[in-house]
Amino acid sequence: QDKPFWPPPIYPM
């Protein structure tokens, strides 16, 4: 299984 994304990806605005 894919490793959990934590912390979640942050998208720069």
Swiss-Prot record:
What's in the keyword line of the UniProt record? Amphibian defense peptide, Pyrrolidone carboxylic acid, Secreted
User: From its record, what is one biological process in GO terms?
Assistant: defense response
Q: Does the keyword Nucleotide-binding apply?
A: no
One Pfam family from the UniProt entry?
Tryp_FSAP
Q: Which residues carry this modification: Pyrrolidone carboxylic acid?
A: Q1
Q: Name one GO cellular component term.
A: extracellular region
Has UniProt tagged this entry with the keyword Secreted? Answer: yes
**Tissue specificity, please?**
Expressed by the skin glands.
The record's subcellular location field reads: Secreted
Which family is annotated?
Answer: Belongs to the frog skin active peptide (FSAP) family. Tryptophillin subfamily.
- What is the name listed in the Swiss-Prot or TrEMBL entry for this protein? Tryptophyllin-T3-2
Q: Which organism is it from?
A: Pithecopus azureus
